């Protein structure tokens, strides 16, 4: 440590370098997550929803046989597919963030840290 309890210049420079690298990697990760298409399905597979790695809705597919079962069945299957897609998408995001930060335990909001 340098005077006044401050780290030496080399340590400070290294910390800034690491911060810049994490920022660049985070931007790249953001682009990768945006490009992902993560599928979630209802238990019977007749409803599917795709989200990006950032939980942005991309598309929905409903089997015509599901539609003939009425509104309640269609809504339940659609919700199940959405929950599945959301869980997979947030899980993917969390894994990728942990890879990016190298286990720094940043306690990011919404990331279960």
From Swiss-Prot:
InterPro entries named among the record's database cross-references: YbaB-like_sf, YbaB/EbfC
Keywords assigned: Cytoplasm, DNA-binding
Listed GO MF terms: DNA binding
Chief subcellular location: cytoplasm
Disulfide-linked positions: none
Keyword Amino-acid biosynthesis: no
Subcellular location per the Swiss-Prot or TrEMBL entry: Cytoplasm, Nucleoid
Keyword DNA-binding: yes
GO cellular component, one term: bacterial nucleoid
Assembly behavior: Homodimer.
Stated family: Belongs to the YbaB/EbfC family.
Task of the protein: Binds to DNA and alters its conformation. May be involved in regulation of gene expression, nucleoid organization and DNA protection.
Protein name: Nucleoid-associated protein sync_0026
